[in-house]
Curated annotation (Swiss-Prot):
Cofactor(s) needed: Mg(2+); Zn(2+)
Localisation per UniProt entry: Cytoplasm
Protein's UniProt name: Phosphoribosyl-AMP cyclohydrolase
InterPro entries: PRA-CH, PRib_AMP_CycHydrolase_dom, PRib_AMP_CycHydrolase_sf
Gene3D superfamilies from the UniProt entry: Phosphoribosyl-AMP cyclohydrolase
Annotated metabolic or biological route of this protein: Amino-acid biosynthesis; L-histidine biosynthesis; L-histidine from 5-phospho-alpha-D-ribose 1-diphosphate: step 3/9
Co-factor binding details: Binds 1 Mg(2+) ion per subunit. Binds 1 zinc ion per subunit.
EC number: 3.5.4.19
Oligomer status and interactors: Homodimer.
UniProt keyword terms in alphabetical order: Amino-acid biosynthesis, Cytoplasm, Histidine biosynthesis, Hydrolase, Magnesium, Metal-binding, Zinc
Residue sites binding Mg(2+) per the record: 85, 87, 89
SUPFAM superfamilies linked to this entry: HisI-like
Length: 116
């Protein structure tokens, strides 16, 4: 496996992304049918790796390490689209999800605690 930390974000993209003070940007991940699957965090290296490989790759704040979705679970994400919101401070990724997107194994992280 390549190391996501070795990937550099294209400067023309980097200047458009507003990373927070920790160097992270939230990524909303949705399926190709528009279902929201999860929210995760990316740094510039994770974003660069995702663009280069088309594999959903994130930065785990709790483990302080890169996380390529499906590397251990087999529940992979093939990225088919990636865009920034109007402020450049959120990434929207469209993926073909194989297996569950949630760490619990569920398809989405947003089906366990429905409030309304």
């Amino acid at each position: 496996m390549d190391d996501p930390a070795s990937y550099e974000l294209d400067p023309s993209i980097a200047q458009r992304v507003k990373f927070n003070s920790a160097g992270l940007v939230p990524a909303v991940v949705q399926s190709t049918d528009g279902e929201v699957l999860m929210l995760a965090w990316m740094d510039a290296h994770a974003l660069a790796y995702t663009i280069a490989t088309r594999k959903g790759t994130y930065f785990s704040r709790s483990r302080n390490e890169y996380w390529i979705k499906g590397l251990t679970s087999g529940h992979t994400q093939q990225v088919t689209g990636l865009q920034l919101d109007c402020d450049g401070d959120t990434v929207l990724m469209t993926v073909v999800q194989q297996g569950g997107a949630c760490h619990t194994g569920d398809r989405t992280c947003f089906d366990a605690d429905v409030i309304i």
